[in-house]
């Protein structure tokens, strides 16, 4: 029986391996060999190599879109070949949905049962946002030679310590038998900057540049704006890195900004405050990067 309780096991695969050689194909070939009939969905293989925080952003919302029991094989492994092992966790999708309840109860066909999913990843912080947004039921260090090679290739732990065991788990191998159970303190996490709210002003950071469009994503969520009394139509001043100000109303779409090139403030598909130019790049002309400070003021 597959991990999702059906005859069609699913692995969603994210990595930094790229698609210019056969690395991803090797991983997927092993997945199909170990778990015949598996459906392997490519999430992304072009993330910035070794960027754990970027990878974490790509995997946190996945349970909203996949059937219960899906195995998420997620990897960027800068410490390949070292004592850094993989961790396998069972998470339960939040009752209000994987992205703070955006679609909960909407009846639009996207809401899933409050069921469990398995993530497997290097224990290097990649699961930070997953664990914070969803919580988890149980976590294990992946060490059993029933699911990983006895002598793993030291330069390719993404294959040996993530792809291979993900296939065994998708095929129904018991999660509790992949290795010893981990205490919460043993799961590596990175620091996530907090959003500060003072009246109708908020402070946060740029979390990502939305390639290839050049839009700017922040860590300020819809719920943070609501706490500050800010909603659609509110005119805002947003200052980046203390020196670069932009002004516009918060609107649902880019087109609401008007002419091409006009500034648009909007909530991205993940529910976070973002900045853009209508049909043009905002980030690239200024060479803006993740990590910049963001200040939002209602006007």
From Swiss-Prot:
Keyword Transport on entry: no
InterPro entries: Fluorinase, SAM_HAT_C, SAM_HAT_N, SAM_OH_AdoTrfase, SAM_OH_AdoTrfase_C_sf, SAM_OH_AdoTrfase_N_sf
This protein's UniProt keywords: Hydrolase, S-adenosyl-L-methionine, Transferase
Protein residues bound to S-adenosyl-L-methionine: 16, 21-23, 77, 158, 210, 215, 269-270, 277-279
UniProt-listed Gene3D superfamilies: Bacterial fluorinating enzyme like, S-adenosyl-l-methionine hydroxide adenosyltransferase, N-terminal
Residues annotated as binding adenosine: 16, 77, 155, 157-158
Annotated EC: 2.5.1.63, 3.13.2.3, 2.5.1.94
Catalytically driven reaction(s): fluoride + S-adenosyl-L-methionine = 5'-deoxy-5'-fluoroadenosine + L-methionine; (R)-S-adenosyl-L-methionine + H2O = adenosine + L-methionine + H(+); chloride + S-adenosyl-L-methionine = 5'-chloro-5'-deoxyadenosine + L-methionine
GO molecular function, one term: hydrolase activity
Oligomer status and interactors: Homohexamer; dimers of trimer.
Function: Catalyzes the formation of a C-F bond by combining S-adenosyl-L-methionine (SAM) and fluoride to generate 5'-fluoro-5'-deoxyadenosine (5'-FDA) and L-methionine. Can also catalyze the hydrolysis of SAM into adenosine and L-methionine, and halogenation of SAM with chloride to generate 5'-chloro-5'-deoxyadenosine (5'-CIDA) and L-methionine. In vitro, in the presence of L-methionine, can catalyze the two-step conversion of the non-native substrate 5'-CIDA into 5'-FDA, via the intermediate SAM.
Family under the similarity heading: Belongs to the SAM hydrolase / SAM-dependent halogenase family.
Protein name: Fluorinase
